[in-house]
Swiss-Prot record:
Keywords: DNA-binding, Repeat, Transcription, Transcription regulation. This is TATA-box-binding protein. General factor that plays a role in the activation of archaeal genes transcribed by RNA polymerase. Binds specifically to the TATA box promoter element which lies close to the position of transcription initiation. It comes from Saccharolobus solfataricus (strain ATCC 35092 / DSM 1617 / JCM 11322 / P2). The lineage of its organism: Archaea, Thermoproteota, Thermoprotei, Sulfolobales, Sulfolobaceae. The keyword Transcription regulation applies.
């Protein structure tokens, strides 16, 4: 079976979105700790206040500068929903919020399964911008320029994608690496591999 017959049928999952949120105002973290339940604040240990939401399941680190780091969202939509819920909670407990929060995604971490086997030795030899030291780590590390992401590619066809700023960059990166690996004859259908074992 030639690689032109290898079909593209990945499963891609967003695992985590890390974003910064700017409120453009300073916050009284001590007042927040006193009035809002289930908040952790120990300035001797960490300068930010830890605010955990159950729905959606995210954690926000809130700093007195009015900046937040929000992590745990599985989609941009979920991230926006979480930020709105955090702001609503702050307002509910008497924290005045002026203006609209500015949200900026810093990193999207995703996983993917190409449903093919990947010849990492061959890929390491033929791909540029990669690092593959199987004695140290079983995956090939590939730095893609467009979109600007890093992919950890495993022989099972599974991978981790990090560094994306938008969800569509993840899908684009997975499609591009699949096409490149297929073009370089580095992928093999899983069925073909299983037939060889029989």
């Amino acid at each position: 079976m030639s690689n032109s017959a290898v079909s593209y049928k990945p499963i891609v999952n967003i695992e985590n979105i890390v974003a910064t949120v700017t409120l453009e105002q300073s916050l009284d973290l001590y007042a927040m700790e006193r009035s809002i339940p289930n908040i952790e604040y120990d300035p001797d240990q960490f300068p930010g206040l830890i605010f955990r939401l159950e729905q959606p399941k995210v954690t926000a680190l809130i700093f007195k500068s009015g900046k937040m780091v929000v992590t745990g969202a599985k989609s941009t939509e979920e991230l926006i929903k979480a930020v709105k819920r955090i702001i609503k909670t702050l307002k509910k407990y008497g924290i005045k919020i002026v203006g609209k929060p500015k949200i900026q995604i810093q990193n999207i971490v995703a996983s993917a399964n190409l449903h093919v086997n990947v010849n990492l030795d061959k890929a390491a030899f033929l791909l540029e911008n990669n690092m593959y030291e199987p004695e140290q780590f079983p995956g090939l590390i590939f730095r893609m320029d467009d979109p600007r992401v890093v992919l950890l590619i495993f022989s099972s066809g599974k991978m981790v994608i990090t560094g994306a700023k938008r969800e569509d960059e993840v899908s684009k990166a997975v499609k591009r690496i699949f096409d490149k690996l297929a073009e370089l004859d580095c992928v093999k259908p899983i069925e073909e591999e299983e037939e060889l074992e029989l």
